[in-house]
């Protein structure tokens, strides 16, 4: 399953909805922030803040692809036992 923004059939993004229970606005705000973070809304807002030249966009996408490939290779190596999993040791 993809963690990208949800897109409706007409191509527009879905509206994020949060239910406020028992007038607990703080909890609703935390849930909204978490949902927006998960869907990449903050990253998208930051990216759209300024114009991005096509060459910059291409470089960013290439860097993201390299990052994804490295992460996938690292996870695969951890599964096969070639490298230790991160966070397993404690520092003193």
Curated annotation (Swiss-Prot):
It comes from the Bacteria. Pfam families: Ribosomal_S21. One of its GO terms (cellular component) is ribosome. Residues 68-77 have a biased composition (Basic residues). Keywords: Ribonucleoprotein, Ribosomal protein. GO terms for molecular function: structural constituent of ribosome. GO terms for biological process: translation. Signal peptide: none annotated. Residues 37-92 are annotated as: Disordered. Residues 51-67 have a biased composition (Basic and acidic residues). The keyword Ribonucleoprotein applies. The keyword NADP does not apply. Belongs to the bacterial ribosomal protein bS21 family. HAMAP family: Ribosomal_bS21. PANTHER family: MITOCHONDRIAL 28S RIBOSOMAL PROTEIN S21, SMALL RIBOSOMAL SUBUNIT PROTEIN BS21M. This is Small ribosomal subunit protein bS21. The lineage of its organism: Bacteria, Pseudomonadati, Pseudomonadota, Alphaproteobacteria, Maricaulales.
């Amino acid at each position: 399953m993809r963690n990208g923004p949800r897109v409706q059939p007409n191509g527009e993004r879905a509206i994020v909805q949060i239910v406020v229970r028992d007038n607990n606005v703080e909890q609703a705000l935390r849930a909204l922030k978490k949902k927006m973070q998960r869907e990449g809304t903050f990253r998208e807002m930051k990216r759209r803040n300024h114009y991005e030249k096509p060459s910059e966009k291409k470089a960013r996408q290439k860097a993201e692809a390299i990052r994804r490939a490295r992460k996938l290779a690292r996870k695969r190596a951890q599964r096969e036992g070639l490298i230790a999993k991160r966070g397993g040791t404690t520092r003193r």
